[in-house]
């Protein structure tokens, strides 16, 4: 995030900008002409706008693209313990208001697809005109799934170990302690 040394990041060929939501700074890039429809690209968990880098040139032929790092990702502000759908979604509502400023198409990958669905339901009236959800894990964390184990049952214990021993995203933490605690 903004507190990380620039040496951590490599140049990606687009001018990265920061938008202050009032709580966090969201890193993002804007590619394409402003007279084209607005397209907000939302990456998956632990990803960055960089995942959209190869897709930006062809998309920019038809859209003005806004690719964003969510809080805790890329150069955006870290907020340990505050990564909820409502917090992430409201960051994006503020981003659409403060940066895009017009009706927007939203497309999200994986957990970014879940956020796209969240925006479809909870964004301000008129902000989102269309939404695309690419491989969203909408039912992956059901407590009692109809068939087979849920994400919470299978990988949930690993996430708990990572949270306890590794710390927040991007920190080094206690790798040896985590390995010793693993079943």
Model regions and ranges:
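Alpha/beta-hydrolase fold catalytic core
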Residues: 1-39, 60-63, 100-103, 128-129
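Alpha/beta-hydrolase
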Residues: 152-153, 165-183
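Conserved acidic functional residues
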Residues: 44, 91, 134-135
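Active-site loop/oxyanion-hole signature of alpha/beta-hydrolase fold enzymes
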Residues: 19-22, 29, 57, 67-107, ...
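Active-site micro-motifs of SAM-dependent methyltransferase domains
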Residues: 47, 72, 113, 138-139
